[in-house]
A protein has these predicted regions:
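Tubulin/FtsZ superfamily GTPase core signature
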Residues: 1-211
Length: 211
């Protein structure tokens, strides 16, 4: 289904393994949405892209052909305010839209940045929906590729991320979790913190590449 190449955590779709399969990549929240936009910009073929967000402005700017605003009634088109409970409730509010978008999938990849509101709270809901699409056969393979906060973001945000990760593990077949601190090993030591955060805005180590 997927391979890891020499870049840790990076997924490469192998043509011989996914031929004929209907693959959907779902970016949840800001970080996940950025990852999807980057994959599209890189020219990745053979998959369907979906962006899910509470933030209507960010959603409109996303490159994904399928955009799902969740929690419109709850957040009024704004973000989840770094509150995973709001993100979860938003996704639950629009479960039917998510289910419709994922229908017919053979494989579902979910990408998100954990620690904030929408990605942390909504990603497990999306994963749960995807995992149930196969019914009793469980035929839909569901994989989550997520990033964890920088340690300097504090214990609260990391705690939220770990809670979200635990919830994801209950719903998916496999999880790849990439600590953002690892990004510091791939950029110059004198890189400003602001630049490190810019790099982390796209889960680069979770980038999917075509055959």
């Amino acid at each position: 289904m997927s391979k890891e190449n020499d870049r840790p955590g990076r997924i490469q779709f192998a043509e011989e393994e996914v031929h004929g399969a209907r693959i959907k990549v779902v970016g949840v929240g800001g970080g996940g949405g950025n990852a999807v936009s980057r994959m599209i910009a890189s020219g990745l073929q053979g998959v369907e892209f979906i962006a899910v967000n509470t933030d209507l402005q960010a959603l409109r700017a996303n490159r994904a052909p399928i955009k799902i605003q969740v929690g419109g009634k709850l957040t009024k088109g704004l973000g989840a305010g770094a509150n995973p409970d709001v993100g979860r409730q938003a996704a639950v509010e629009d479960t039917e839209k998510i289910c419709d978008a994922l229908e017919g999938s053979d494989m579902v990849f979910i990408t998100a940045g954990l620690g904030g509101g929408t990605g942390t709270g909504a990603a497990p809901v999306v994963a749960s929906i995807a995992s149930q699409l196969g019914g009793d056969t469980g035929s839909v393979l569901t994989v989550a590729v997520v990033t964890l906060p920088f340690s300097l973001e504090g214990k609260r945000r990391m705690g939220q991320a770990m809670d979200g990760l635990a919830q994801l593990k209950e719903c998916v077949d496999s999880v790849i979790a990439i600590p953002n601190d690892r990004l510091l090993n791939s950029v110059a030591r004198n890189t400003p913190v602001s630049e490190a955060f810019r790099v982390a805005a796209v889960p680069a180590d979770a980038e999917a590449t075509g055959p």
